[in-house]
From Swiss-Prot:
Gene source species: Drosophila virilis
CDD domains: bHLH_TS_TWIST
Gene Ontology MF terms: DNA binding; DNA-binding transcription factor activity, RNA polymerase II-specific; protein heterodimerization activity; protein homodimerization activity; RNA polymerase II transcription regulatory region sequence-specific DNA binding
Protein name: Protein twist
GO cellular component annotations of the record: nucleus
Length: 519
């Protein structure tokens, strides 16, 4: 069997629990080890914080009150108790507020905080020391005049400061600080009352700072803000130290249930900061009250909701939307929360005059109605384009029909006029050829009439001489006339077939073209 090595047990105490006595004992050594940077020290001297200034002012006020009280009353002071459990007992040393030390912070943060507070604490102790010396001198002069002097005066005279100071200006903590029983360090009941009032004021300020986030952003109605403003304007006596944001006198006091009607739920506004509301009280109060009274009806209709009356069948949804939008914009313009862009976008009919909005109470329940302008319907661009396109289409149809009928007429004319197979005539050439054909027909008719007359004369004579006369007539006549006469004699009627006539016209046409070219 192999022997297992026993591992040593290590106990680690990771809990860091510094106690108050340890830190109090090391505070003097920490101040010696840490050197305050000169730049940081000068910055603290030149730019004190607002809290330090307020604390110094409170200390000066308390010291002045204490000096006045000591001059007026010369009484026997009660001895100082050996221990000071309360923070009010430290007021005799000029320290009205104790520093809250976080004892659960690490060591490096303890060093940094002690170094930062060293400069301020030294300044406070110097001021307190100077004031305390003046108090001791006044007390010594008063006590020398009295016959009986307590034993504590001798100790105070021997040590005018009443306590020892170290090299850094810090008061050294020792048992003598608590055992000294001088008349100057004793507390009167009036002084304790003043200190208690200051502590209560500080507690109220802390509570107000915690509740300010919730109070400032509570949604309230316009009526509630107006009621709070009237209450704020009432004469009240408050001390100068009380904060204006006191929770006991809040600007957002809610009204009773009887005053919160249904029509008020439509007019929610988020309240601004109390400072801005206080500045606008005198300007907005009368306008808001007058505008709200204009929307309320008489005594018999207190519970009547004018906004819900629009839900009836008398008004349409668009009317309700327009009226609600006009009322909301009017409320925002009176309350000072309207935007310039919204006012510019609104039409003058929606805004109206101030008198028309504020004098709406005379209407006794008649809601604000936007007048509708019924204009003539203008044709849209699409309708105009459609009409134009229809007209264009009809014109094109008529043009095609006209062209088609003209082409049909020329085709019929070309069929009547004798043409050659090689002819590719245009419309103008077709018309010219038609005129020439008409001229040819006129000549044929005139020559045929003469030949017919001669033929009739020859028929009355015997056949042989008639035949001889006919042969001489044919020889005398040219080609077309001779053929025409022969045809007429053969048929016995003056009718020429179209084929023969076209052939004759073709021959005549070619002869005319040849003569024209020669010329």
């Amino acid at each position: 069997m192999s022997a297992r090595s026993v591992s040593p047990k290590v106990l680690l105490d990771i809990s860091y629990k510094p106690t108050l006595p340890n830190i109090m004992e090391l505070q003097h050594n920490v101040i010696k080890l840490i050197q305050v940077e000169q730049h940081a020290y000068m910055q603290l001297m030149e730019q004190p914080t607002a809290h330090y200034m307020q604390q110094q002012q409170q200390q000066q006020q308390h010291q002045q009150q204490q000096q006045q009280h000591q001059q007026q009353q010369q009484q026997q002071y009660a001895p100082l108790p050996s221990l000071a459990p309360n923070a009010a007992d430290y007021a005799a040393y000029g320290i009205t507020e104790l520093e809250d030390t976080d004892y659960n912070i690490p060591s490096n943060e303890v060093l940094s905080t002690s170094s930062n507070h060293s400069a301020q604490s030294s300044l406070e102790l110097n001021n307190n020391q100077h004031n305390f010396e003046q108090q001791q001198q006044q007390q010594q002069q008063q006590q020398q005049q009295q016959t009986a002097t307590p034993a504590g005066v001798a100790t105070a005279a021997q040590t005018p400061h009443g306590y020892m100071l170290n090299e850094h200006g810090k008061r050294s903590r020792s048992s003598s600080d608590y055992d000294c029983q001088t008349d100057a360090l004793s507390m009167q009941p009036e002084h304790k009352k003043l200190l208690q009032q200051q502590q209560q004021q500080q507690q109220q300020q802390q509570q107000q700072q915690q509740q300010q986030l919730y109070v400032d952003y509570l949604p309230t109605t316009v009526d509630e803000v107006a009621a709070a403003q009237t209450q704020a304007q009432a004469p009240t006596q408050q001390s100068a130290c009380l904060s204006p944001h006191s929770h006991s006198h809040s600007h957002f006091d809610f009204a009773a249930d009887e005053e919160l009607q249904d029509h008020k739920a439509h007019i929610f506004k988020y309240g601004g900061y109390p400072q801005t509301i206080a500045q606008q009280q005198q300007q907005q109060q009368q306008q808001q009250l007058h505008f709200q009274s204009s929307y309320r009806t008489g005594q018999n209709y207190e519970a009547y909701d004018p906004a819900n009356s629009l839900n009836g069948s008398t008004y349409s949804s668009s009317d309700r939307d327009d009226m609600e939008y006009a009322r909301q914009t009017a409320l925002s313009s009176v309350g000072g929360y309207a935007k310039e862009d919204e006012l510019e976008d609104m039409s003058p009919t929606c805004l109206g005059d101030d008198s028309s909005l504020l004098d709406a109470g005379d209407a006794a329940g008649k809601a604000f109605r936007k007048p509708r302008r019924r204009l003539k319907r203008k044709p849209s661009k699409t309708e105009e384009t459609d009409e134009f396109s229809n007209q264009r289409v009809m014109a094109n149809v008529r043009e095609r029909q006209r062209t088609q009928s003209l082409n049909d007429a020329f085709k019929a004319l070309q069929q009547i006029i004798p043409t050659l197979p090689s002819d590719k005539l245009s419309k103008i050439q077709t018309l010219k050829l038609a005129t020439r054909y008409i001229d040819f027909l006129c000549r044929m008719l005139s020559s045929s009439d003469i030949s017919l007359l001669k033929a009739l004369e020859a028929q009355s004579s015997p056949v042989s001489p008639g035949y001889g006369n006919a042969s001489t007539l044919l020889s005398a006549a040219n080609g077309a006339e001779a053929d025409l006469k022969c045809l007429r004699k053969a048929n016995g009627a003056p009718i020429i077939p179209p084929e023969k006539l076209s052939y004759l016209f073709g021959v005549w046409r070619m002869e005319g073209d040849a003569q024209h070219q020669k010329a």
